[in-house]
Regions:
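Core subunits and conserved enzymes of cellular information-processing
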Residues: 1-252, 256, 260
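Short, charged juxtamembrane terminal tails flanking transmembrane helices
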Residues: 265-269
Length: 269
């Protein structure tokens, strides 16, 4: 049996630096996403579908938006455990401290944005659209960090894996369900809709659209960067520290990755 190669100090420091950069990208992405949520919420046209339930509890109980976001997401982590059972990895429990940080980011973002509430419907619409773009940008950064998914996305991924449906289809069902739950709680407890309005529908459409546009731009930018790097050195295989810390992949996503890899190989040839 060949001897196992020892990890050199240079290799260890490189792995640590790479992981640190990914975690930094995750943190920046979380605050950016929180800022997007704050913008759409303060616009007063309805918050994002994933934030409707926490926002209703914030209005009804007086707890901060970040606090209710944390507790609602704890239930989403529990939902992943129920859906995946033995397939649930303990690594996915890292979503709990991650969403705690995200909740703090939301409270900070709300404190920054709240004093700048729009005066009319049109300015509110502009703020809502801007918030959706900022939110999409934050989501893309979190995904590109290849670290830890938020419980909201983790729950959808788990449901997609169990039902063998596409992520997009389950995401739509999840958003509609959360919005209906928030609307029901608002009607029962306050006799009116709370946080669910035209802006909620707008967010359901625009966030995904903006995210696709941002990804295309980033990918095109990456092509130029990779082309320059390829001219200097041969492409290297992915390193272990470049893999995701937590990941629940559906069969569709796996096939997409294989297709991307084949296309990359063909382009190099």
């Amino acid at each position: 049996m060949p001897p196992v190669p020892r990890q050199t100090p240079v290799g260890s420091s490189r792995r640590f630096a790479h992981l640190s950069l990914r975690l930094l990208l995750l943190l920046i992405g979380m605050f950016t996403a929180a800022l997007g949520v704050a913008l759409t919420t303060v616009a007063d046209l309805g918050t994002t579908p994933i934030s409707t339930v926490p926002y209703v509890f914030t209005v009804l109980t007086g707890y901060s938006f970040g606090t209710t976001t944390f507790f609602v997401n704890i239930f989403l982590v529990a939902g992943q455990v129920l859906l995946l059972r033995r397939r649930f990895s303990l690594w996915n429990l890292l979503q709990i401290p991650t969403v705690l940080i995200f909740g703090i980011c939301i409270d900070l973002a709300m404190a920054i944005v709240s004093p700048h509430a729009p005066a009319g419907w049109w300015t509110g619409l502009l703020m809502s659209i801007s918030g959706n773009f900022v939110l999409a940008f934050g989501i893309v950064m979190q995904i590109r960090s290849k670290t830890i998914v938020q419980p909201g996305e983790g729950f959808v991924l788990a449901a997609a894996a169990v039902t063998r449906k596409s992520f997009g289809s389950i995401k739509i069902v999840n958003d509609v369900t959360l919005s209906l739950i928030a609307a029901g709680i608002g009607f029962v407890c306050a006799g009116e809709l709370i946080g669910v309005r035209e802006g909620t529908v707008l967010s359901a459409v625009l966030v995904g659209l903006f995210a696709k546009l941002i990804v295309k731009f980033v990918d095109r930018l990456g092509v130029f960067v990779q082309a320059g790097a390829a001219a200097i050195q041969e492409p290297q295989p992915p390193q272990p520290h470049e893999s995701a810390i937590t990941a629940i992949q559906t069969s569709e996503e796996t096939n997409d990755q294989l297709t991307d890899e084949r296309s990359s190989v063909q382009n190099r040839q």
